[in-house]
């Protein structure tokens, strides 16, 4: 680096000299300071009016000749040993300019954000149609599709990848829901007895479209009720909430009440008849009770059907009162069964005691 000053006063020279030689060693500082304190101008080169100070020199301490910035003469300046890198450079007017080596800061281009591709309905229809043909199109097919829909081949490839992933996910979900027993409870539902299944299936299959079908249903239902249903099932059927559902909705309230009254009268008459026949055998009493209940049920169904045909009414009338009457009558019948069995046991006990006394 070079330092050149021209027509500089002693005060400015001393200040500038101190600034320049601040980075040198102590020996150069002393020499330069002595030269600055000497104000008679002896340190100024005789061949030029400018003074040149070398801040870098050869290893042996000598400085190469320096060309003055203001003239064509050369002069030897006072210089020291090895110099450093950056320094102050004069511009010929007494002002110093700092020089520094700065790295090249290359501005990196901002990363472009890829916008989401928006497909038109026509493009989606074409892509879906090709996806229905094949899920894995080759490069030629993708290029052909891209030309048809106005997209790039890479966009078409990405769309097929996303579409395959969506299809696999949907297929997996569908297979989970289609697995037998995946969402069903582990325990099975209780099965109805076979006679009840037959009767209720016949009832729902006919769907109350004609009263002859209903009469056939009741005729089919009566023997099952008399032969296959015990007393507690009959009471549950009569008193439970399902009894109102078991009746057809078009049965009128008046006809149903008349049939219930007729059935109650039959039950009371059967009770008196059953009490009068206690002296008979057990088999005979059971047979009489069966024969007694069969006509009563037959009378109930026949009376209700005839009353329903004579006076039709809307199907939405409540039948809670009639179901209550039916439950009371059937529960009375169950009590009569229970009383008959106890009486027969007592009668057998008395007969056994009498036979024992006779043997004695």
Swiss-Prot record:
<dbReference type="Pfam" id="PF03826">
    <property type="entry name" value="OAR"/>
</dbReference>
<dbReference type="GO" id="GO:0000981">
    <property type="term" value="F:DNA-binding transcription factor activity, RNA polymerase II-specific"/>
</dbReference>
<keyword id="KW-0217">Developmental protein</keyword>
<feature type="DNA-binding region" description="Homeobox">
    <location>
        <begin position="112"/>
        <end position="171"/>
    </location>
</feature>
<dbReference type="InterPro" id="IPR051895">
    <property type="entry name" value="OTP_Homeobox"/>
</dbReference>
<feature type="compositionally biased region" description="Low complexity">
    <location>
        <begin position="295"/>
        <end position="311"/>
    </location>
</feature>
<dbReference type="InterPro" id="IPR001356">
    <property type="entry name" value="HD"/>
</dbReference>
<feature type="compositionally biased region" description="Gly residues">
    <location>
        <begin position="69"/>
        <end position="95"/>
    </location>
</feature>
<keyword id="KW-0238">DNA-binding</keyword>
<comment type="similarity">
    <text>Belongs to the paired homeobox family. Bicoid subfamily.</text>
</comment>
<dbReference type="GO" id="GO:0005634">
    <property type="term" value="C:nucleus"/>
</dbReference>
<dbReference type="Pfam" id="PF00046">
    <property type="entry name" value="Homeodomain"/>
</dbReference>
<feature type="region of interest" description="Disordered">
    <location>
        <begin position="295"/>
        <end position="326"/>
    </location>
</feature>
<keyword id="KW-0804">Transcription</keyword>
<dbReference type="InterPro" id="IPR017970">
    <property type="entry name" value="Homeobox_CS"/>
</dbReference>
<feature type="short sequence motif" description="OAR">
    <location>
        <begin position="340"/>
        <end position="353"/>
    </location>
</feature>
<dbReference type="InterPro" id="IPR009057">
    <property type="entry name" value="Homeodomain-like_sf"/>
</dbReference>
<feature type="region of interest" description="Disordered">
    <location>
        <begin position="48"/>
        <end position="117"/>
    </location>
</feature>
<dbReference type="GO" id="GO:0030182">
    <property type="term" value="P:neuron differentiation"/>
</dbReference>
<keyword id="KW-0539">Nucleus</keyword>
<keyword id="KW-0805">Transcription regulation</keyword>
<dbReference type="InterPro" id="IPR000047">
    <property type="entry name" value="HTH_motif"/>
</dbReference>
<protein>
    <recommendedName>
        <fullName>Homeobox protein orthopedia</fullName>
    </recommendedName>
</protein>
<dbReference type="GO" id="GO:0003677">
    <property type="term" value="F:DNA binding"/>
</dbReference>
<dbReference type="InterPro" id="IPR003654">
    <property type="entry name" value="OAR_dom"/>
</dbReference>
<keyword id="KW-0371">Homeobox</keyword>
């Amino acid at each position: 680096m070079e330092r050149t000053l021209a027509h500089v006063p002693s005060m400015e020279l001393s200040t500038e000299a101190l600034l320049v030689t601040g980075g040198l060693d102590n020996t150069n500082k002393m020499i330069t300071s002595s030269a600055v304190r000497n104000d008679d101008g002896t340190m100024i080169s005789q061949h030029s009016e400018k003074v040149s100070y070398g801040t870098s020199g050869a290893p042996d301490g000598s400085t190469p000749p320096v060309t003055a910035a203001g003239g064509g003469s050369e002069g030897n300046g006072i210089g020291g040993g090895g110099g450093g890198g950056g320094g102050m450079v004069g511009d010929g007017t007494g002002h110093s300019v700092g020089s520094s080596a700065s790295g090249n800061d290359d501005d990196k281009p901002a990363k472009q954000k890829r916008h989401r591709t928006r497909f038109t309905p026509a493009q989606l229809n074409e892509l879906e149609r090709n996806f229905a043909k094949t899920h894995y199109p080759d490069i030629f097919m993708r290029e052909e599709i891209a030309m048809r829909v106005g997209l790039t081949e890479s966009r078409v490839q990405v769309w097929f990848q996303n579409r395959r992933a969506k299809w696999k996910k949907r297929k997996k979900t569908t297979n989970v829901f289609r697995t037998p027993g995946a969402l069903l409870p582990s325990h099975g539902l209780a099965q109805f007895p076979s006679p009840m299944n037959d009767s209720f299936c016949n009832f729902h299959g006919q769907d109350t479209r004609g009263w002859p079908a209903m009469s056939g249903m009741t005729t089919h239902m009566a023997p099952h009720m008399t032969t296959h249903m015990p007393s507690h099932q009959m009471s549950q059927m009569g008193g439970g909430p399902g009894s109102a559902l078991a009746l057809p909705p078009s049965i009128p309230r008046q006809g149903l009440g008349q049939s219930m009254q007729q059935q109650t009268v039959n039950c009371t008459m059967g009770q008196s008849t059953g009490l009068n026949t206690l002296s008979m055998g057990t088999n005979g009493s059971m047979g009489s009770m069966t024969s007694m209940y069969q006509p009563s049920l037959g009378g109930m169904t026949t009376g209700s059907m005839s009353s329903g045909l004579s006076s039709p009414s809307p199907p939405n009338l409540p039948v809670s009162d009639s179901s209550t009457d039916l439950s009371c009558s059937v529960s009375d019948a169950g009590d009569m069964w229970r009383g008959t069995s106890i009486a027969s046991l007592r009668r057998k006990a008395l007969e056994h005691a009498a036979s024992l006394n006779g043997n004695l």
